[in-house]
């Protein structure tokens, strides 16, 4: 499959980016579901997005499209997950999609290409960066997977801190089990100044 980095349009308009990404997806025999296209349109409009669709509904493709948009717009984008195994899995998937030179990984155990424009990391890594650098952090976009970990008594802070300390970022929040996200969406909009689209909730 063609590397997405090779398809970055000269004009990174929302329409151009959606067309290129859709064609790339369809070249592998996949069609976007309506909720995936709706999510990507919101990302391309500059909105935060909260995706609460069931497991197996293609949230990974939404994340991929979000990273593509950020890369095209010259924004550094972060993918966070709760466990190192999932971070590793996503790192290799994104390397395949964008090329290894564009993707980095940082966990408590390893650091690979940490200055890359797309970085996969555990939630705690990004939270600590947010605490250290805040508004000065190079974080134009944050994709947070398995966001229901926010409710974990011992680890939930790592999902909360970026929302508070990185108001410059566009957030793409994903989980199959979030429940009512009205308050979260309102809070995100207030903190970031971006509209927040809720998909599937």
Regions of interest found by a model, annotated:
Residues 10, 18-25, 29-201:
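Conserved P-loop/Walker A NTP-binding site and adjacent catalytic elements of P-loop NTPases
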Residues 1-13:
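Interdomain "pre-motor" coupling segment immediately N-terminal to P-loop NTPase/helicase cores
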């Amino acid at each position: 499959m063609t590397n997405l980095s090779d398809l970055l349009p000269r004009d990174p308009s929302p329409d151009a980016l959606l067309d290129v990404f859709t064609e790339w997806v369809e070249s592998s025999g996949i069609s976007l579901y309506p909720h995936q296209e709706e999510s990507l349109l919101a990302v391309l409009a500059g909105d935060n997005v909260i995706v609460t669709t069931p497991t197996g509904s293609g949230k990974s493709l939404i994340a991929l499209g979000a990273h593509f948009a950020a890369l095209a717009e010259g924004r550094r984008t972060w993918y966070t997950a709760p466990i190192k195994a999932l971070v590793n899995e996503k790192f290799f998937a994104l390397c395949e999609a964008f090329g290894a030179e564009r993707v980095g990984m940082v966990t408590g155990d390893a650091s690979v290409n940490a200055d890359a424009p797309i970085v996969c990391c555990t939630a705690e890594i990004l939270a600590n960066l947010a605490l250290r650098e805040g508004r000065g952090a190079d974080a134009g976009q944050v994709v947070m997977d398995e966001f229901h970990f926010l409710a974990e008594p011992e680890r939930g802070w790592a999902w909360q801190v970026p929302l508070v300390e990185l108001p410059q970022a566009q957030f793409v929040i994903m989980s199959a089990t979030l429940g009512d996200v009205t308050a979260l969406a309102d809070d995100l909009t207030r903190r970031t100044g971006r509209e927040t689209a809720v998909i599937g909730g």
